[in-house]
Amino acid sequence: PVAIMDNYENLRKRYRVGVNNALTWTPIKGLTAKTELYLNRNWNETQNWTGNKAEGEKYNTAKLTKGDGYYTRWSTTLNYDVQGLGDDHKLGVLVGNEVSASKSNSSYIKGVGYPDEWDMGYAFANMNMSDKTLGLDEYNNTIGTPSHTLSWFGRINYSLYDRYLFTATMRADGSSKFSKDNHWGYFPAVAAGWRISEEP
């Protein structure tokens, strides 16, 4: 156990930047418009060092894993409470859309066979100086494919006497992850309710 502790080091770093802004306004009575923009950017790095004196290890080994990515979302909605229907009827209509995009990349490097006098910091500063004759080095680099989605949605809410409720929704989602011939999915739904507690 002591040998493992003395010959094993792990360093992980993560960074994230996020921005979320929203704007809401009411141009006319009953109509509320809202737009929201969200941005997220992230980076991460992990350094793993295993010395040759650790249990089960023959060589000094350095492993470096890196990743980065982003996610953005922009949504806009219009919500209108219909005016002039009297006290018995309430009708609300909402329409909107949402656009999002994301992507992630990753890379992995493993170097084996560094000189005994090297420590973790020196090895990671000179990862290309591993012992290539061992044939144990590994390299992998993945460039992610951007993913995009576009959604349109709408909702109608109606109530009579605040007792009898009806809701209808419709959503259409398009995604770059869907098959080429079927980029869109459609999701309609209806619901009804009755507030017994409001009955006279």
Q: What do these predicted ranges mean?
A:
Residues 1-3, 48, 52-62, 105-139:
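Surface-exposed loop/turn segments flanking beta-strands in extracellular/periplasmic regions
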